[in-house]
Amino acid sequence: DGTPFTAEDVIFTWQYCTAPDGGCAQKAQYEGVKSVEALDPTTVKVTFTEPKYYPYSAFVGAQSPIIQKAQFKDCVGAKAPGCTSANFGPIGTGPFVVKEFKPNDVVTYVANPNYRDAAKPAFASVTLKGGGDAPSAARAVLETGEFDYAWNMQVEPEVLATMIAKGKGKIETAFGTQVERINLNCFNPDPALGDKRSTTEAGPPPALKDPAVRKALSIAI
């Protein structure tokens, strides 16, 4: 909205999302955050209760945006669900502003006139269509050309190849703010162990006791 984005907004976001009875959907992102301190108007110091292998999701991840203190200061805790206007029209610093929002259907954005880079954004408006599945999203871009971009192209390779052959679009890969990882079960998953399966009491899986197996898994990944 043209007002400064400051460290106080970052601190407030943490306080807002961890307030009791607030119902913040991303509260889990802030687990382990001990304190948030403003060192100057544009710098914050975040202290954790213990070392974090990936400490960024709490404040710069795609799932936990910073909210404006001035807009939400009266919406903390149990008051949060009642702040309909703020909840459906949060003020941010991005290149676009929400013009229309239909839950589980469509979101329409228009260029933010207050954006920090006057030369951007490159588009006057953007429409995001929800619902459907990966094949229908891929088809709308690659096969019919109905949309310009689709996320989640997890479609069988042979099906994807047929769509690409239509010549309406192409596949591009890029880095995002989220992390994909493979979790290895380090405990015995044998169903015969009952409630102890896949717990510390179960001990390691028999196969993983062999160093050669562990090395093979490492090479495969």
Task: For each feature predicted by the language model, list its residue ranges.
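Surface-exposed binding/hinge segments that line
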Residues: 5, 26-76, 100
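Tryptophan-centric aromatic hotspots in well-structured domains and transmembrane helices
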Residues: 14, 48, 55-56, 84, ...
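A short beta-strand/turn structural motif
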Residues: 52-93, 97, 120-123, 127-128
